[in-house]
Design a protein with these regions (language model features):
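Secretory/extracellular carbohydrate-interaction modules
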Residues: 38-167
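Short, exposed beta-strand/loop patches in secreted or surface proteins that constitute
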Residues: 20-32, 196
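Extracellular carbohydrate-recognition regions
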Residues: 1-25
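Hydrophobic residues embedded in beta-strands of well-ordered beta-sheets
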Residues: 34-37, 203
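Ligand-recognition surfaces built from glycine- and aromatic
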Residues: 69-73, 80-83, 221-270
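A mid-sequence, solvent-exposed acidic-amphipathic segment
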Residues: 155-191
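Short strand-turn-strand beta-turns centered on an Asx-Gly dipeptide
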Residues: 206-211
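Short tryptophan-centered beta-strand motifs in secreted/extracellular beta-sheet-rich domains
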Residues: 72-74, 190-198, 203-205
């Protein structure tokens, strides 16, 4: 499918002024001359640390810049493998529902992205996929068909603590929330080209498609826009399960860890 590039960032020079830098705590950006490293070193569980760029700070959600159809391409690698990298990290599009950068009221999540979370994070929203790890993922909890679920959320969560009821009750809820997930089939410490196509109805994810053309490793329902772009590495963990377990906290990160990016492109699709 032909595409028209809107953003092409190669990180060989200074960071484009279109990006907001969000650097808090022990988070830092380190240009190498040909790449950009998003670094967290010496983070404490007493303070949030984040190295991030985005394009939505200061905007109301209705003015977030991205809607389908589009394609995101990112070439990246991480300093540590899954399970040894601490906190959360990734890149893609979301509606900033938890207002980590401030200025808006909380809301329910919409996202389409490559997302990493280390233990003790547990966001097991797909029965076939672990609650942490390096994933491709989609969610749209603001779909009209999903909103009535709020009235039955508590009793449903209690019932789903029984495995047999979880297997019966969760699949239609997962469908209503447009939840799709799959582990990324690659070593995250190696350089890879990550591609997602966000269509009106479907979201598709590839890894290194230029090396070995193949079907997407995840083909999932697409969330709606508008959403903002984000690329980050931080020291938080999150817990949200169908059984009603919720939690949030911060992790100590003593050793240096990073997400390194050397290419980022966002292109409109016809």
């Amino acid at each position: 499918m032909d595409a028209a590039s809107i953003i092409c960032e190669e990180f060989a020079t200074s960071l484009s002024p279109r990006w907001n830098r969000y650097l808090v705590g022990a988070g830092a950006l380190e240009p190498t001359g040909s790449t950009m490293r998003f670094v967290v070193t010496g983070a404490s569980r007493r303070r949030y640390s984040d190295a991030q760029i985005d394009d939505y700070q200061g905007l109301p959600r209705r003015r977030f810049p991205w809607r389908p159809p589009l394609r995101l391409t990112v070439r990246a690698r991480f300093s540590h493998p899954s399970g040894e990298l601490h906190g959360t990290a990734g890149f893609g599009f979301w509606n900033d529902p938890f207002v980590m950068s401030g200025g808006r009221l909380p809301t329910l999540p919409r996202a389409i992205w490559f997302f990493y979370a280390s233990p003790p994070s547990n966001m097991k929203l797909d029965p076939e996929v672990p609650g942490h790890g390096w994933k491709a993922a989609t969610i749209d909890a603001l779909r009209p068909v999903a909103l009535p679920l709020g009235f039955v959320a508590l009793p449903a969560a209690l019932l789903m603590n029984a495995p047999s009821l979880y297997r019966r009750l969760w699949p239609p809820i997962q469908h209503a929330l447009n939840v799709g997930e799959a582990l990324v089939p690659a070593d995250m410490t190696d350089w890879h080209t990550y591609v997602l196509e966000w269509g009106q109805k479907r979201a598709r994810f590839w890894i290194d498609p230029e090396e070995a053309p193949s079907p997407p490793f995840l083909d999932a329902p697409a969330p709606r826009g508008p959403q903002g772009f984000v690329l980050w590495l931080d020291n938080q963990y999150l817990v949200a399960t169908p059984q009603g377990r919720f939690g949030w906290g911060l992790l100590n990160i003593e050793k240096r860890q990073w997400l390194e990016v050397d290419y980022l492109e966002i292109a409109r699709l016809p």
